[in-house]
C-alpha cells in the first residue's frame, strides 16, 4: 500500500514539474506562431547581435560610415546653393525657407478619436476569477471594453483577457 501511494506522489510531482517547466520556459513553440529571438546577456559582455559581419556585406562604396545623414536636411538646399533645372524663384521668397513646413503637427495629438476609443469603459465590474491557467503570457481576445460587443466588458478571464458579461 505504501509503495503504491509513493508511486502516485512521484507521478503527480513529475506532472506538476513538467507543467511548471513548460509554463516558465516555453521550451517548444509551433513554427511561425509568435516565435521571437531573445538575446541573452552574460555578465561583463554585450549583446552578440551585430558583432560579426556576414561575408559579402560591407559598407556601400562611396558612403561615409562616420557621418549619418538626416533625411530632412538632405532634401533642403544650402543657403548659397543655386536652384536646380526647371525650378523658378519666387520674388521676395528665400528658396531655403520655401521648402520648410509652416506648422508642425504633433502626431499623438492628431488622433484624439483613437485615444477616446481606447479609454472608453462600459458600466459594471468584471466577474471574479477563482482559477487561472498556468500559461506565462496567455493570449488576449480583447484589450479594451470598446472591442467587446453590446454590454460586455473586456475582463481578465481564466486564461487571458476576454469579453464577459459584467456583474
From Swiss-Prot:
Keyword Disulfide bond: yes
Region (Disordered) residue spans: 46-104
Stored InterPro entries: Elafin-like_sf, Trappin_transglut-bd_rpt, WAP_dom, WAP_four-disulfide_core
Ranges: Sequence repeats: 44-49, 50-55, 56-61, 62-67, 68-73, 74-79, 80-85, 86-91, 92-97, 98-103, 104-109, 110-115
Cellular component GO terms, alphabetical: extracellular space
Cystines in this chain: 126-155, 133-159, 142-154, 148-163
Record propeptide residues: 22-70
Signal sequence, start to end: 1-21
2 X tandem repeats of SVP-1 like motif: annotated segments: 78-126
Domain spans labelled WAP: 119-167
Protein name: Elafin
Family matches, as Gene3D superfamilies: Elafin-like
Pfam families associated with the record: Cementoin (PF10511), WAP (PF00095)
Positions of SVP-1 clotting repeats: 80-101, 104-126
Biological process (GO), any one: innate immune response
Expression sites by tissue: Trachea and large intestine.
GO molecular function: serine-type endopeptidase inhibitor activity
Keywords in alphabetical order: Disulfide bond, Protease inhibitor, Repeat, Serine protease inhibitor, Signal
PROSITE patterns to which the protein is assigned, alphabetical: WAP
Taxonomic lineage: Eukaryota, Metazoa, Chordata, Craniata, Vertebrata
Bias type Basic and acidic residues, positions: 79-91
Superkingdom: Eukaryota
CDD domains registered for this protein in UniProt: WAP (cd00199)
Function: Neutrophil and pancreatic elastase-specific inhibitor of skin. It may prevent elastase-mediated tissue proteolysis.
UniProt cross-references to SMART domains, sorted A to Z: WAP
Keyword Lipid biosynthesis assigned: no
